[in-house]
Amino acid sequence: MSDGIGYYSRRASHVVQVGGVPMGGDNPIRVQSMTNTVTMDTEACVAQVLRIAEAGGEYVRLTTQGVREAENMRLIREGVRKAGCKVPLVADVHFNPRVADVAALYCEKVRINPGNYVDAARQFKHLEYTDEEYAAELQKIEARLVPFLQICREHHTAVRIGVNHGSLSDRIMSRYGDTPEGIVESCMEFLRICMKHDFLNVVISIKASNTVVMVQSVRLLVQQMEKEHMTFPLHLGVTEAGEGEDGRIKSAVGIGALLTEGIGDTIRVSLSEAPEREIPVAKKLVESIGECARLRHEAEQHIADDTVTLRLCETDWESLQLKAAMAAGALLIDGKAHQLIIHNEGFDEERLVALADNILQAARVKFTKTEYISCPGCGRTLYDLEGTIRRIKAAIEREQRRLACIAEREPARLEETKAATAHLKGLKIAIMGCIVNGPGEMADADYGYVGAARGKVSLYRKKECIERNIPEEEAVEKLMELIDRYEKK
């Protein structure tokens, strides 16, 4: 974080003890990842935890979809410790608070999701509550949460209250709408209970695949915590960021916007790739905070003609991608400019223009290509997520190439082919491993490909499920047919 003296000041937070690796306070910003192995496969989980730790991951999260998986965390932890690795393990819990109770016995931290901890899973139904009825719902949450906090207190287990935009409850959505205020209140309800019962070993996160929603919501959360005299440390991440260059840029735009403002105590770069590949990217973001805070400040001072201009001196392409996205992200998200120019000797102008376009798209300023929202996968994913993403991207690219060839061979059909591909620019396709955030993220996507059962997929258009339980080997073709059916009407 060098080269940023005078431009970067970190938000004050209290220390949360996660095993032997504390976060918050004056501790370094921690980097972490999550396994994508089946939690009942102890050997595979141990091996992947060790790979993540060897890459530099400081916490490793595993999905615990049931009590059986939570119980198996004991064996996974034993295997990791026998290998001489002390990395803290985190259980990821949705839908069943009993699972969190069990996981707290064996893990250094447990993540719970306010959207489905006590509230029913999201059904996109509008619910009417009187103030008294709403207060009664909060009492139900408190009655269930307090015994869990007591277990955590007795076993020195930390808690992450992790809100996902894609899994807000119908209760929250009905009262606050699909807004940053609703996302923040979903978190604050739980934090107030923790404060009331003097349980402070809590880290919090607010994540979304939409970088604008994520940044605005985290900023609002920080403001609300300050009003209520809370100093909980923050975990940052852009959920379902994708893979490859797009995933890295989107993560750098969202996470970097906040890091350069001094917000964030631990980060995860969620990529639809092998989880150990997330760690070097996360480390680069942390190491670049000071420099990017300076670049952001200088770029803001020289905005002209609605354009952010960045001047960098990188020799490594990935470092250039990440630093440019970090430095420009907040300026674009906040609407201070709507164009971006990047200067960096050693890379040709065409490549730099494409990078600028990708950053503009990640900041949701200008859409020049199809956007893919894809989760990193976890033990809940029952199909080949990474391979599917490649096949869907390839299918879209084949269609674009086919129409481009027609235009080249038959110039008279140029306007026809432009019209035929116009819908692919800015089209949002969500490729989700399971039902936790899948249906919720459909609200921000045009089409969705969501894991249903082992080897089976459901296809969505917006919030509506169009086809259920399609065999995996047929699903990509069916998705393309669905897009063709609706987009060419």
Where are these regions (language model features)?
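Conserved, mostly hydrophobic/aromatic
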Residues: V31, D92, I161, I204, ...
